[in-house]
């Protein structure tokens, strides 16, 4: 089994504590409300919301896929780090065993956040992941992130 790693970084004007609350801790409620084309709903199928929890995410009409299952691998609220894996769903296909993510929110000098994301694609056999496929997924994630950021800018009292 090969592992393909992809790192990306982008910025936000929203400070890490507020962004983490919206983007990580309340994403299951917030995203279906503000971006139903991306995520229709999310439900916990196993666990209590902490490490080890498995969630089924029903993707919206704007997605080419129907669902994914996320497993929470790490949740560090003090340092704004979130680790999770996509362990099932039509989005990972038959060539990938799982995709593990580490998201870190770091304070930027301007008072906003630097979002550092590392993805590990655990491939079945000697399959190679095309970088264009990964970049397309990252562009969708960045678009969803901007929707969340715009929601927070429009609602300055939310998630404080």
Swiss-Prot record:
Natural source organism: Fragaria ananassa (Strawberry)
The EC number(s) this enzyme carries: 3.1.27.-
Tissue: Highly expressed in roots. Expressed a low levels in ripe red fruits.
Alphabetic keyword roster: Allergen, Hydrolase, Nuclease, Pathogenesis-related protein, Phosphoprotein, Plant defense
Protein's UniProt name: Major strawberry allergen Fra a 1.08
Top-tier EC class: hydrolase
Pfam families found in the cross-reference section: Bet_v_1 (PF00407)
Function recorded in the entry: Possesses ribonuclease activity in vitro.
Family the entry assigns: Belongs to the BetVI family.
GO biological process, one term: defense response
Family annotation (InterPro entries): Bet_v_I/MLP (IPR000916), Bet_v_I_allergen (IPR024949), Plant_def-hormone_signal (IPR050279), START-like_dom_sf (IPR023393)
GO molecular function, one term: signaling receptor activity
Protein modification: Phosphorylated in vivo. Phosphorylation prevents its activity as ribonuclease.
Entry GO terms, CC: cytoplasm; nucleus
Cross-referenced SUPFAM superfamilies: Bet v1-like
């Amino acid at each position: 089994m090969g592992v393909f790693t992809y790192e990306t970084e982008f910025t936000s004007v929203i400070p890490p504590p507020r962004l983490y609350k919206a983007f990580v801790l309340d994403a299951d409620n917030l995203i279906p409300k503000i971006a139903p084309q991306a995520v229709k709903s999310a439900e916990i199928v196993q666990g209590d919301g902490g490490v080890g929890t498995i969630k089924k995410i029903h993707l919206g009409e704007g997605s080419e896929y129907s669902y994914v299952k996320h497993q929470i691998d790490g949740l560090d609220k003090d340092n704004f780090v979130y680790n999770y894996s996509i362990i099932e769903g039509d989005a990972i296909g038959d060539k990938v065993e799982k995709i593990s993510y580490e998201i870190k929110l770091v304070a930027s000098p301007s008072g906003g956040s630097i979002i550092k994301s590392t993805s590990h694609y655990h491939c079945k056999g000697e399959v190679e992941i095309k970088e264009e496929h990964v970049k397309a997924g990252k562009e969708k994630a960045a678009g969803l992130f901007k929707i969340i950021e715009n929601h927070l800018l429009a609602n300055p009292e939310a998630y404080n």
